[in-house]
Amino acid sequence: GSANMVSFIAKQHGRNHTFYTQYAFRKEYASFDSYVKNHNFANLDYVYSTLSNHDGENPVDYAAFEANPTGFTVVACNAEDGSTKYFGKSDVGYDNFDILKASSAVPVACEPYAIDGVPYYDGGIADPIPVQKAIDDGYDRIVVILTRPKDTVREQKRDIGPARILRRTHPQAAEKLLNRYQTYNDEVALAKEYEQDGR
């Protein structure tokens, strides 16, 4: 999600499509070999530095991203204590997309990504649909894009196995993952309430 928004804000329409349809099949991008070598199925440095930096194959137009007044918030989960971390647009820099790496580090498939010495996992664990965060930040109209029908109730069973594995190294993040289903369902319910209110 966060990487898609960077391209959108930079007005590089079609950029993400290239990542999903061309680069994603490269073994440097994501592969079992990468997982065996460095415990990361997805090579976040390859995706968000090698390809995306100014001298990369498909660079982010950082000047356009920075000039666009559109707000930008990225969610990550602190791997050590399970807390939610919100990063802002000012946390992105020229050839510095570390917050995208942190927010894309899927537990078990990837090691947590450290920023300023703090390891982070994908924000979908801690705040999968940050509707309340958007309201708290003062937005009165919110668009929620779901990958499943809005009446689908998320179940815990898909997260039990990964949470058991994660508990060995990051028990607090594992607890967040184990309860993600409830957080997701609560936030969808909240979004529906706001929808009924015309927000």
Predicted regions mapped to residue ranges:
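Glycine-rich, charged/polar anion/phosphate-binding loops
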Residues: 58-59, 127-131, 188
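Active-site gating loop/helix substructures
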Residues: 66-167
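A generic, well-ordered mixed alpha/beta core segment in the N-terminal half of proteins
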Residues: 53-56, 122
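Patatin-like phospholipase
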Residues: 1-54, 88-102, 143-146, 150-159
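A short acidic, glycine-rich active-site loop
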Residues: 168-186
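C-terminal helical/tail subdomains of lipid-metabolizing enzymes
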Residues: 188-199
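A short alpha-helix-loop-beta-strand transition element characteristic
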Residues: 55-70
